[in-house]
């Protein structure tokens, strides 16, 4: 099968540096918003390619691929959308543009603090794996989303940030 995506099995220096950059804010947010820092970090790594995607770099700083506007600012980017029948089509869509990583992290936390995401909150789960399972189909349509996040958490020992 040529369509199998590679899994992260060994840590990269680029990702380790990215974690060091955003982890202080992620820890602060996780305590304030009842979230797992490990899941927040893993999602940022996965969604932004460790801060290397065009959307996550300056001047956009969008770490989570959140569409729409942030304080009136957005950037048009190509994205693949599923038509509901499994057919992927590339479209141009507006994505939120942030002044920095911190704003992106806090905006994401605000998004998942809505009741829709209650199944992701630390107080409603027994482990980060419950939270990653809840995000699958809720935040992302990718059926392998939880396993991808769990693999990142394990590879980089991100659960240490949940203590």
Which residues make up each language-model segment?
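Catalytic cores of secreted/periplasmic lytic hydrolases that degrade extracellular macromolecules
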Residues: 1-163
């Amino acid at each position: 099968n040529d369509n199998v995506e590679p899994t992260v099995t060994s840590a990269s220096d680029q990702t380790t540096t990215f974690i060091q950059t955003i982890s202080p804010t992620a820890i602060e947010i996780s305590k304030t918003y009842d979230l797992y820092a490990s899941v927040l970090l893993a999602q940022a790594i996965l969604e932004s390619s460790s801060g290397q995607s065009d959307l996550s770099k300056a001047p956009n700083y969008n770490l989570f691929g959140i569409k729409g506007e942030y304080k009136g600012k957005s950037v048009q980017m190509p994205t693949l959308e599923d038509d509901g029948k499994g057919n992927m089509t590339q479209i141009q869509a507006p994505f939120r543009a942030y002044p920095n990583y911190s704003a992106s992290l806090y905006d994401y936390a605000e998004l998942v603090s809505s009741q829709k995401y209650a199944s992701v909150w630390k107080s409603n789960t027994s482990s980060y794996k419950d939270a990653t399972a809840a995000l699958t189909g809720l935040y992302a349509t990718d059926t392998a989303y939880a396993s991808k996040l769990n693999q990142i958490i394990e590879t980089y020992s991100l659960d240490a940030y949940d203590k």
